[in-house]
Amino acid sequence: MEIFGHVVSGLGEGKFFVGLTHYKNKFEELTGFTPFEGTLNVKLKHNFNLDEFNPIEFDGFEIDGKKYFGGKVLLIKLFNKQGNSINCAVVAPKKTDHSKKTLEIIAPIQLRKFLLLKNSDVVKLVI
């Protein structure tokens, strides 16, 4: 399945969360790659129901009394308008400030730099 969306600025929290050792190790286990510390945010025209695609679930954890929530991961391939692509994953935390129209994507590299992306660029996600 192909889905199109636009690159948008995030909330600035992806770098922190992906950088946490527990999340980083879990994402590596589930995706097969060590994620770059940050996410690419892609806004869709319609709500996205990750559960329709059999995502992989992961549990939350606790550090020094602070609870970090689990979520779901879905492996995808992301393409820029030039047709360059990379294997990556949509991450859907159980607790998020994003709408169901905004996807957070992790990859082994900085997607904006590797795929030469800027805000409003159209990207294609292949599931």
UniProtKB/Swiss-Prot annotation:
Keywords: Flavoprotein, FMN, Kinase, Magnesium, Metal-binding, Nucleotide-binding, Transferase. InterPro entries: Archaeal_Riboflavin_Kinase (IPR053397), RibK_CTP-dep (IPR039063), Riboflavin_kinase_archaeal (IPR023470), Riboflavin_kinase_CTP-dep (IPR023602), Riboflavin_kinase_dom_sf (IPR023465). GO terms for molecular function: magnesium ion binding; nucleotide binding; riboflavin kinase activity. It catalyses: riboflavin + CTP = CDP + FMN + H(+). FMN binds at T96, E104. Coiled coil: none annotated. Its cofactor is Mg(2+). SUPFAM superfamilies: Riboflavin kinase-like. CDP binds at G10, L11, G12, E13, G14, K15, I109, Q110, L111, R112. Its EC number is 2.7.1.161. Binds 1 Mg(2+) ion per subunit. Mg(2+) binds at T39, N41. Pathway: Cofactor biosynthesis; FMN biosynthesis; FMN from riboflavin (CTP route): step 1/1. GO terms for biological process: FMN biosynthetic process; riboflavin biosynthetic process. It comes from the Archaea. HAMAP family: Riboflavin_kinase. Belongs to the archaeal riboflavin kinase family. Catalyzes the CTP-dependent phosphorylation of riboflavin (vitamin B2) to form flavin mononucleotide (FMN). This is Riboflavin kinase. The lineage of its organism: Archaea, Methanobacteriati, Methanobacteriota, Methanomada group, Methanococci. The gene is ribK.
